[in-house]
Amino acid sequence: MIRILVSNDDGVNAPGIKALTEALTEIATVLTVGPDRNCSGASNSLTLTNPLRINRLDNGYISVHGTPTDCVHLAIRELYDGEPDMVVSGINAGANMGDDTLYSGTVAAAMEGRFLGFPAVAISLNGRKFEHYQSAAVYARRIVQGLLAQPLAKDQILNVNVPDLPLDQIKGIKVTRLGARHKAEGIVRTQDPAGREIFWLGPPGQEQDATEGTDFHAIANGYVSITPLTVDLTAYGQLTALQNWVDKI
């Protein structure tokens, strides 16, 4: 039977990972390994200065005192008896579109699976109330089944964003590119109860590029967005111009 590793960045007890695990258990043997706390914004960070501690939970999940990337790396390298056929990360409580992907622990967990040689998908639910995890779970299962039936190129990650809508209100799937946000809003300066100065990072910026063809546009119009991401960050279109610049300095 197909074997799928499920992880996330919201934590192993988050509702999204539960909905995803249950949906994929219908088609595969699932191992669920997630952080023991919310690690949103962890990106691709690894824990290198402390040991990783795990806890095997009563529901069969494994919690890790580490980052999403730690979870996937540890699961594949040590916790799995053999190897998974695929890595699926999510369902994230919140969008991972445009610039979000660089900060996202959800995308990073999928990326680690891709680094280690496995097909990988990141699933996120875009909304404010996060009421329709089941809608995202249905699309996650559909996409995973599609990948199993017709595998895609091995150098890509599928970044999937689902609008927080009832299933019958979602219009379908759009293949998209990443949009872009304006820079994040300002830092919030305040004090703790002892009067010491503390700071909170402001919320992400509003959409800057949400034109047709972007993930932002698809979600705003009631579609699921699928964006292929690559691990290779090289700006190939700039290589010649950069070489010409280097030759002159």
From Swiss-Prot:
Main location: cytoplasm
Protein EC: 3.1.3.5
Pfam families xrefs: SurE
Note on cofactor: Binds 1 divalent metal cation per subunit.
Top-level taxonomic group: Bacteria
SUPFAM superfamilies: SurE-like (SSF64167)
Catalytic reactions on record: a ribonucleoside 5'-phosphate + H2O = a ribonucleoside + phosphate
Gene3D superfamilies assigned: Survival protein SurE-like phosphatase/nucleotidase (3.40.1210.10)
Subcellular location(s) of the protein: Cytoplasm
GO molecular function, one term: 5'-nucleotidase activity
Residue numbers binding a divalent metal cation: D9, D10, S40, N92
Cofactor(s) needed by this chain: a divalent metal cation
GO cellular component, one term: cytoplasm
InterPro entries (UniProt xref): SurE, SurE-like_Pase/nucleotidase, SurE-like_sf
First-tier enzyme category under EC: hydrolase
Alphabetical keyword list: Cytoplasm, Hydrolase, Metal-binding, Nucleotide-binding
Disulfides per UniProt: none
Residue ranges the record marks as coiled coil: none
Role of this protein: Nucleotidase that shows phosphatase activity on nucleoside 5'-monophosphates.
Family, as annotated: Belongs to the SurE nucleotidase family.
NCBIfam families the record matches: PRK00346.1-3 (NF001489), PRK00346.1-4 (NF001490), surE (TIGR00087)
Protein name, UniProt field: 5'-nucleotidase SurE
Organism: Shewanella baltica (strain OS155 / ATCC BAA-1091)
